[in-house]
Structures are given as structure tokens and as C-alpha cells.
From Swiss-Prot:
GO biological process, one term: amino sugar catabolic process
One Pfam family it belongs to: GKRP_SIS_N
Residues annotated as catalytic: 82 (proton donor), 113
Taxonomic classification: Bacteria, Bacillati, Bacillota, Bacilli, Bacillales
UniProt subunit comment: Homodimer.
Species name: Staphylococcus aureus (strain bovine RF122 / ET3-1)
The EC number(s) this enzyme carries: 4.2.1.126
The name this protein goes by in its record: N-acetylmuramic acid 6-phosphate etherase
Miscellaneous comment in the UniProt entry for this protein: A lyase-type mechanism (elimination/hydration) is suggested for the cleavage of the lactyl ether bond of MurNAc 6-phosphate, with the formation of an alpha,beta-unsaturated aldehyde intermediate with (E)-stereochemistry, followed by the syn addition of water to give product.
Similarity remark: Belongs to the GCKR-like family. MurNAc-6-P etherase subfamily.
Amino acid sequence: MMENSTTEARNEATMHLDEMTVEEALITMNKEDQQVPLAVQKAIPQLTKVIKKTIAQYKKGGRLIYIGAGTSGRLGVLDAAECVPTFNTDPHEIIGIIAGGQHAMTMAVEGAEDHKKLAEEDLKNIDLTSKDVVIGIAASGKTPYVIGGLTFANTIGATTVSISCNEHAVISEIAQYPVEVKVGPEVLTGSTRLKSGTAQKLILNMISTITMVGVGKVYDNLMIDVKATNQKLIDRSVRIIQEICAITYDEAMALYQVSEHDVKVATVMGMCGISKEEATRRLLNNGDIVKRAIRDRQP
């Protein structure tokens, strides 16, 4: 149990925040924010274990599920939503659950975070399985909703991860893979949407991005599995094909159209000079990983 919560402590550097000029306040806030990536850096050993396990479970058909309340919950929903266009994931593969439901994304839902049972019900509603990875996010490390979610996930046999911004957090005792990032007291006392929220966003960026790299949705540093939902992303898709295959934009567009807007298939077609059907077969035989499919010379 936590005896002292640093996320609720007063920050000595901002005791006179209300007396600072705008520029002084900005300089102070920026200086405090600079501590965040350094704090996250210290958690890389733990995050490495989390991501390796997440990759393994994802390859087995498991899902990545974020669960949290308030700012923590919103950040989980945001990261999950961004994975759909970025990595062409199914909306049901990476899920963000927030206490109080979708209404809580824009409005405070009073008391939602205080109910452990509510998290259990939310996880039951998505048919949680032992293959899934549940990441409980709570700056304080003691949010009842997150405690309830992680506890229930453990009973199902799911992989459980906790992300908190306090040492000796309650959720760290529940999760199989605890991650604690000490960002120190907030600029505005107790406002964990600030440094704590920034740390959580950086961590979720790492988890989702590196996991997707690990399951073959990235070629070099390109979004090879991008889902083109607008003109900007269509253009990006074509330029990715153009870049990898070293061809003209028009040639890349032709491949993109023949492949029925599948960047992976189009890339293998262009690199190997083969048909859509053959490119699809090679990807299927090589775990949907483009570099392996390109190297595959089997008839």
C-alpha cells in the first residue's frame, strides 16, 4: 500500500505559480515536463518485458486492452483508436475501455472510477480471454476501477500489466507486469493530466508501436499496413510503395490499385515482379511479413 503519493504532493518549484508572469510559468512548466521522458527511460527494462509478452500473445490471437478512468482511460481509448488507421488493426484487436463508457470521453462521469465491479462487467462485455493482455492505467496506482479490472483479468488467466506514476502502487501488487514511472509532483497539485498523463501517453505510444513492429506491420520505419481512410493516407500509401520499390508515383499508384489498396501486397508485387495472387500467397506463407515474403523464392 502507498503511504505517500507523489502525484498528490505539492511541487516546491511551483508554490507561487499564481504569482508568476505568463513567461515564468511557461518556463517552469516546460522545465518540469522535461523530467518526464527521463522518468520513462528508467522504465524501459520493464516495458521490454511487457512488449515481448504482448507480441507473443497478439500472435496467438490475443488482444491488447487498455483500461482506466479519467485522463488515464481517455489516453487508452485514444491510443487504441489511432491503431486502426496507422496499423490497419481491427477495432476489436486493440481496445480502450474507460470507466463510465464513451460518455466519459468528453464528460466527467461521477463516481465511475470508484467501482471495482464496473470494470469486471466491462471486461466481461468484450468476452475477455486468457490470450488477452489487459493494461491497467492509473496515475495514482490505486484507482478502484483499475484494481477491479486487473483482479478480474487475473482470474481469467489474461496477462496483466499496470502503469502508475507512484512507487509501491496498489496495482503494481496485482499486475503480473508492473510499470512504475516516477514523474514527481505535478505543476498543479494533483492534476495528473499533466506530467503523469504525458508519461502515460509516451508509454502507450511505445507499447502499441513496438508491438505492431513485432507483428510485422512496419517495413523499416514505414507504415506498411496503413489503412487509407482519407486522401492523405491514400497518398501516403502510394508513396510508401514508391519508396520501397524505387519506382515512380504513377507506377506505385498502379500497383496500389491492382492490389485493391493493399500496401503490403502491392509492395511484394513491385519488388518481386509477381501477380497479386502470388504476392498474397507469399505473405500468407511468411506470417504477413513483407521482408520475408520478398525473400521467399519458393515456387
